[in-house]
Amino acid sequence: MGSCCSCPDKDTVPDNHRNKFKVINVDDDGNELGSGVMELTDTELILYTRKRDSVKWHYLCLRRYGYDSNLFSFESGRRCQTGQGIFAFKCARAEELFNMLQEIMQNNSINVVEEPVVERSSHQTELEVPRTPRTPTTPGLGAQNLPNGYPRYPSFGDASSHPSSRHPSVGSARLPSVGEESTHPLLVAEEQVHTYVNTTGVQEERKNRASVHVPPEARVSNAESNTPKEEPSNPEDRDPQVLLKPEGVRFVLGPTPVQKQLMEKEKLEQLGKDPVSGSGAGNTEWDTGYDSDERRDVPPVNKLVYENINGLSIPSASGVRRGRLTSTSTSDTQNINNSAQRRPALLNYENLPSLPPVWEARKLSRDEDDNLGPKTPSLNGYHNNLDPMHNYVNTENVTVPASAHKIDYSKRRDCTPTVFNFDIRRPSLEHRQLNYIQVDLEGGSDSDNPQTPKTPTTPLPQTPTRRTELYAVIDIERTAAMSNLQKALPRDDGTSRKTRHNSTDLPM
């Protein structure tokens, strides 16, 4: 960089100027190299000197900055005008300069990005650091400690601050900048970090928070936390709620129509059963639905793994379905509104109503169409005209009976589908037939005894699977004779254009 000379405006700038400060550039040994005026604008840091133009450092390119008594220093990045380097300046108002720069950083929400560095102990003595000036490429690169634990930077004119393409990252010996915690308003407290459902440690973290607003259905005393919990209210009577929490908003949705139908069905089934099974359900803990290590051990008979199933589950296709919906009526009742008992970190996007599917049926032959069984009504209000495994419906806790895979296409022509149907029916092939022509060439090319083509009276099968012997055969010799006759015709019919290149061609 070279040494800095005295600034021409040194005497004209008052000592108490708001954003201009008189500074003296120093090296790492504290030797004064030159004086100047440091100005802080809204976007950049400017140093005015006498024998050169002003030097500017944009705030976004500053890696760190700090001060110690009467010394202000900062580190610039590669994108600055001076390139990568560390600069130190003596200033009687170093603290004011630092506070003003920090305030500008906060007002503009500028976050100084720190790279992963090697931590250095704060009790490092000056004897451990060589006193000679050095560049960042020197293996013994270190930083002289200041009373506040942050390193003293090389001078403005030191070789270490000179931009060079050979310079490695100075961050290899970097420490967090002065006032870093207060400088970065974008840092979020740990309690405000978004935690998603099915994350390990969510339940334990929420148990340790006393200030978290617990929803009414999950509000239990400490004495009752170790005892089996019961459902606070009937899920059918629960209304949608919006709960405000310090970490976000939770939407508690009511049961879907499909869940209401299943709950009514379970109530009717439980009326005819022994009430002992209902009392035994109170001795089991509720499944929170979290796929974490904190899930408590519950007998597999009374525990149900709840999932939002995409597509209907078929008992006959157990190897394809994803949800395990094989449990007793007691566990179904416990988990029928399982999502309402969950305690997610933020928004609860569950129990969404199912969407109508888009059918894409394949064409069936007449034999398959006639062998299909009676039509089965759908559980979600739509026609089961297709294979249920190809219906991408967001259906929750719905089990399709084994007869649901039987499809009736014969009745489908008479009813109007309630959803989009891209099945374009082709006309029936009952009255269509294709007659092939057979030409017998055993007689050779004898023109005196022409062969009469034979037309078969019996139609061929609709879908031939192998080659047949009845194909149209081309007479090669007759075709060649017709071709030669065509070539013998005059080529000039009066429409072709005559040029000097083809005017000598005479008609044949």
From Swiss-Prot:
Residue ranges with Basic and acidic residues bias: 117-131, 227-240
Region (Disordered): 116-180, 201-243, 268-298, 315-345, 441-467, 483-508
GO CC list: adherens junction; cell-cell junction; cytoplasm; cytosol; plasma membrane
Compositional bias annotation for Polar residues: 325-341
SUPFAM superfamilies: PH domain-like
Lipid attachment residues per UniProt (N-myristoyl glycine): 2
Tissue-specificity statement: Ubiquitous. Expression is highest in brain, kidney, lung and testis.
Residues with Phosphotyrosine modification: 196, 306, 349, 392, 436, 471
Phosphoserine: residues carrying this PTM: 177, 211, 221, 365
Purpose of the protein: Adapter protein that links activated FGR and NGF receptors to downstream signaling pathways. Plays an important role in the activation of MAP kinases and in the phosphorylation of PIK3R1, the regulatory subunit of phosphatidylinositol 3-kinase, in response to ligand-mediated activation of FGFR1. Modulates signaling via SHC1 by competing for a common binding site on NTRK1.
The protein's assembly and partners: Part of a complex containing FRS2, GRB2, GAB1, PIK3R1 and SOS1. Part of a complex containing GRB2 and CBL. Binds ALK, CKS2, FGFR1, RET, MAPK1/ERK2, MAPK3/ERK1 and SRC. The tyrosine-phosphorylated protein binds the SH2 domains of GRB2 and PTPN11. Interacts with NTRK1, NTRK2 and NTRK3 (phosphorylated upon ligand-binding). Identified in a complex containing FGFR4, NCAM1, CDH2, PLCG1, FRS2, SRC, SHC1, GAP43 and CTTN.
Protein name: Fibroblast growth factor receptor substrate 2
Organism: Mus musculus (Mouse)
Lineage of the species this protein comes from: Eukaryota, Metazoa, Chordata, Craniata, Vertebrata
